[in-house]
Amino acid sequence: MKFEASSAVLLLIDMQQGFCGAQGSSGRRGRDVSVLKPSVESAARLLPVCRAAKIPVIYTRMAFAPDYADGGLLTAELRPGLKKNNDLRADMPDADIMPEIAPLPGDLIINKQRYSAVLRTELEPWLRARGRDCVIVGGVTTGMCVESTVRDLGQRDFKVFVVPEACGDFNADNQKRSLDVFALAFGRVVPEQKMIAAVKTGAADFAIDPRFDW
């Protein structure tokens, strides 16, 4: 799969206070948000390299309206605790991007109300209108919103390059399983340093993982 910086974007999924911050809703519910810190740090290393190469940066946030009218079945029945606890509201600190990777003017910030960043958002039309078909991906959590997004992008013929260090999950088994699924069927899993080198070079060919070359 050929990577070309001239047709690439960096997509950072849900690296926001609600999931990654100690005072965010996940932290308040007792989750160990420190396990996601390495992924934010990796994203912080990718950002300046991509910016220097003029690669657009896109952030997504899981962010609901104050009344959760846009939450559908997700907040009504699947995860009603989100609404009950006022979690992940667009008008509250939960929606804020982590300061280590703060957006700059001109970056695209997409609010989403479903796990996939493709579903019911402007992401796909924005990419197609600009001829950007190579998507470098990092984000949280790997087994939920990252996986939902990678699957949707891969099946829409976008070239997806997942940086494992820039992805984080509360569950290590979910992390490994999802990365294997990405490598098997939906894109390429490219270590951070190799991805940085490709961005600086401007292009690279990434072979299929030999475990799945059958």
Specify the residue positions occupied by each region the protein language model found.
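Active-site loop signature of alpha/beta-hydrolase-fold enzymes
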Residues: G18, A65, D169
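A short alpha/beta connector and helix-capping loop motif
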Residues: S6, G24-C50, I55-V57
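Short acidic, Gly/Ser-rich segments with clustered Asp/Glu that frequently serve as metal-coordination loops
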Residues: Q16-A22
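Active-site-adjacent betaalpha module
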Residues: M1-V9, R45-A53, D70, L78-W214
